[in-house]
Amino acid sequence: MEEQTTNVIQIYVNGTEQFNASFDFNITDVKESTDTYEFYIIGLFLSCLYTIFLFPIGFIGNILILVVNLNHRERMTIPDLYFVNLAVADLILVADSLIEVFNLNEKYYDYAVLCTFMSLFLQVNMYSSIFFLTWMSFDRYVALTSSMSSSPLRTMQHAKLSCSLIWMASILATLLPFTIVQTQHTGEVHFCFANVFEIQWLEVTIGFLIPFSIIGLCYSLIVRTLMRAQKHKGLWPRRQKALRMIVVVVLVFFICWLPENVFISIQLLQGTADPSKRTDTTLWHDYPLTGHIVNLAAFSNSCLNPIIYSFLGETFRDKLRLFIKRKASWSVVYRFCNHTLDLQIPVRSESEV
């Protein structure tokens, strides 16, 4: 009798342990499913906002910059040439972003070709954008400190050569991480990330820290030069407007790309403090919603550049008004667009600082 009682108790204990283990597992499962569902809903909402408000501006705006400037090749200035190349880089990222922002479950990362292809586009755009903005800051400093008629460095031939070298440098800087980017698997989740410690340091250093140090130095010198130029009242308004556009472009780039670089830097610092974490899952896996937000912020830069270029660039507004005048079928359309672009555009000399 005692033996039967013992067996019953043993069966009850075993069954209770199995039930508790199963219950704990189910609770954990439900919690993970709830967190995943919340991330998906919030991420989908943010992606929809980006697609409705920013993507059309970035896609149409960058195409418009290319079309308008290519239709006025004879009036293209050196800053225009740099902004055309910047628009090409931005257009690549904007087109890529439409796939990225809705890829919340990372399904296409199952395919190594797509993983590599998307990473290539992102890297080329990042490097080309920051390299062009860095060079534009240097070009602005040269324009302000040199006589436009006698500056041997600031010519259209040199500008075209500079653009070619910048694209080559962007591609070369991309090749190293491009060759080692691969899919990473964590259970049933797939991630595409160049999770190599040295490569990540390279991205943050030459793609963010060094360029912005150069930009900061250039603008410090530009501010000092402009303060000295206040005596020449005729030059000050024109130089101030040209400087305003490039400062806003760089500032927007910094605000948009800073979160992602901070996100990467945190992972790098964790790997420095504990080398065993260098092979662990990335922060994009541990904090998917934060990773999604910093990606959207980075994509937003390429969407905002056309707005800055259109409203702050008087040369572009002038060209856009002429382009609309030629293409518009109805005078009402032309008058509306002409009023929107600002009727009072001051007369400028052919060379623009």
Curated annotation (Swiss-Prot):
Membrane topology note: Multi-pass membrane protein
Alphabetized UniProt keyword annotations: Apoptosis, Cell cycle, Cell membrane, Cell projection, Cytoplasm, Cytoplasmic vesicle, Cytoskeleton, Developmental protein, Differentiation, Disulfide bond, Endoplasmic reticulum, Endosome, G-protein coupled receptor, Golgi apparatus, Membrane, Mitochondrion, Neurogenesis, Nucleus, Postsynaptic cell membrane, Receptor, Synapse, Transducer, Transmembrane, Transmembrane helix
Residues making up the signal peptide according to the UniProt record: none
An individual GO BP term: positive regulation of embryonic development
Cystines in this chain: 115-192
Alphabetical list of SUPFAM superfamilies matching this protein: Family A G protein-coupled receptor-like (SSF81321)
MF GO annotations: G protein-coupled estrogen receptor activity; steroid binding; steroid hormone binding
Null allele phenotype: Morpholino knockdown of the protein leads to growth retardation and developmental deformity.
Tissue expression remark: Expressed in brain regions that are known to control reproduction and sex behavior. Expressed in ovary, muscle and intestine. Expressed in early germ cells of the testis, including the spermatogonia, spermatocytes, and somatic cells such as Sertoli cells.
Compartment(s) where it occurs, according to its Swiss-Prot or TrEMBL record: Nucleus; Cytoplasm, Perinuclear region; Cytoplasm; Cytoplasm, Cytoskeleton
Extracellular-side segments: 1-40, 103-112, 182-202, 267-292
CDD domains in alphabetical order: 7tmA_GPER1
Pfam families: 7tm_1
Transmembrane segments: 41-61, 82-102, 113-133, 161-181, 203-223, 246-266, 293-313
Membrane topology (Cytoplasmic): 62-81, 134-160, 224-245, 314-353
Organism domain of life: Eukaryota
GO cellular component, one term: axon
Entry similarity comment: Belongs to the G-protein coupled receptor 1 family.
Assembly and binders: Homodimer. Heterodimer.
Protein name: G-protein coupled estrogen receptor 1
Organism: Danio rerio (Zebrafish)
